[in-house]
């Protein structure tokens, strides 16, 4: 719901306060829900200590609702550099706090959870201190804003939930069809592909969301921004994943050790998936900026159907290499079908201008990776045997 503030460019103090208190209330209700289910979960898993840890985790929700609102204000005001500085400093302080607790107290896992809470509390404290006073909420409520922001937030939450389930569908099938051993190999390869996305996607959203929101009433300029953004992101993503692909034998040896070199055989098959996936951050940002989270939700349903249909073929070819390849196949299909189901309804761009931004880059990327794989042009760990 925090991105609703960015979408609503001109918002009154009363409307802003309404969104703030609704977000805080929902955050606290989520925390109470965690407290309520803590003991049933610990009983189900026969781990008595788990209940206390889950209840301790609920502390985070005391500040997360407020934190997300202030973060949205920083993004809307394009104060990303200050926001990044706050996050780096508070993460370092929270890390130091966690290490001290682990070293000088018997808290164990609880120290890590308290470290997360300390990080959130420090961040909101710094954001309040460095943020504008006009961002601070008042005790006012606007019913119209409440309903519109709630509708916006529910669709966005639904989209994120479906997206997470879709991301894990392949792992469920590998575990069911091929067993735990191959699931372990597959999961390590996929995690290596996903890790850069966890860093890149939030940056894309933070940079794109306020700019798209500013131009939401200027369709021509919005289309130009989207097309330019797509091309730049694809170019950056292609270079990043090309480097990961060529260095994959070394990366696997360093991260997983020589016993898991089978992981490296799956990575080239997943590279196109990783390269194309950052486009999802851009499409998500443009739907949120235009207040079209309902279209984003329905598109995620369609994308999930595409993934399930492609994954269904795994029962015909139950090979872990084929499952790795289906990730890339699914992402290509999602990139194509995103146009009629999502991009055209939201910003009205024709297919050819959209396709030109990523198909040519993807074709060159696939060609280079194919040549590297065919002629075994990977950088090998044996070249660095003195250090590895």
UniProtKB/Swiss-Prot annotation:
Its main location: membrane. This is Amylovoran biosynthesis protein AmsL. One of its GO terms (biological process) is polysaccharide biosynthetic process. It is a multi-pass membrane protein. The chain crosses the membrane at residues 24-44, 47-67, 97-117, 231-251, 297-317, 359-379. The lineage of its organism: Bacteria, Pseudomonadati, Pseudomonadota, Gammaproteobacteria, Enterobacterales. Belongs to the polysaccharide synthase family. One of its GO terms (cellular component) is plasma membrane. Involved in the biosynthesis of amylovoran which functions as a virulence factor. It is found in: Cell membrane. Coiled coil: none annotated. Pathway: Glycan metabolism; exopolysaccharide biosynthesis. Keywords: Cell membrane, Exopolysaccharide synthesis, Membrane, Transmembrane, Transmembrane helix, Virulence.
């Amino acid at each position: 719901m925090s991105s609703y503030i960015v979408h609503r460019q001109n918002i009154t103090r009363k409307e802003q306060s309404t969104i703030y208190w609704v977000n805080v209330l929902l955050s606290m209700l989520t925390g109470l829900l965690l407290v309520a289910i803590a003991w049933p979960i610990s009983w189900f898993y026969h781990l008595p200590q788990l209940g206390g840890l889950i209840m301790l985790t609920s502390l985070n929700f005391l500040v997360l609702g407020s934190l997300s609102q202030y973060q949205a204000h920083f993004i809307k005001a394009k104060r990303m550099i200050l926001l990044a500085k706050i996050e780096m400093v508070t993460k370092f302080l929270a890390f130091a706090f966690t290490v001290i607790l682990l070293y000088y107290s018997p808290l164990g896992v609880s120290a890590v959870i308290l470290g997360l809470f300390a990080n959130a509390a420090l961040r909101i404290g710094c954001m309040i201190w460095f943020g504008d006073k006009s961002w601070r909420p008042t005790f006012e409520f606007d019913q119209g804003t409440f309903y519109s922001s709630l509708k916006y937030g529910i669709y966005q939450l639904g989209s994120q939930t479906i997206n997470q389930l879709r991301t894990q569908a392949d792992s469920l099938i590998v575990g069911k069809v091929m067993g735990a051993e191959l699931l372990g190999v597959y999961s390590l390869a996929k995690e290596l592909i996903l890790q850069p996305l966890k860093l890149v996607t939030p940056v894309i959203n933070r940079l794109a969301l306020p700019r798209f929101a500013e131009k939401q009433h200027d369709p021509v300029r919005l289309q130009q921004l989207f097309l330019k953004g797509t091309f730049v992101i694809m170019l950056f993503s292609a270079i990043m994943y090309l480097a990961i692909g060529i260095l994959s034998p070394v990366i696997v040896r360093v991260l997983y050790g020589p016993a898991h070199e089978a992981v490296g055989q799956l990575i080239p098959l997943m590279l196109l998936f990783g390269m194309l996936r950052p486009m999802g951050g851009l499409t998500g940002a443009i739907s949120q900026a235009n207040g079209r989270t309902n279209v984003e939700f329905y598109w995620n349903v369609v994308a999930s159907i595409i993934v399930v249909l492609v994954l269904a073929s795994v029962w015909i070819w139950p090979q872990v290499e084929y499952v790795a390849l289906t990730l890339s196949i699914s992402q290509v299909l999602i990139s194509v079908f995103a146009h009629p189901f999502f991009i055209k309804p939201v910003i009205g761009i024709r297919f050819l201008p959209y396709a030109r931004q990523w198909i040519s880059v993807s074709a060159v990327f696939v060609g280079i990776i194919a040549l590297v794989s065919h002629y075994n042009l990977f950088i090998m760990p044996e070249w660095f045997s003195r250090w590895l």
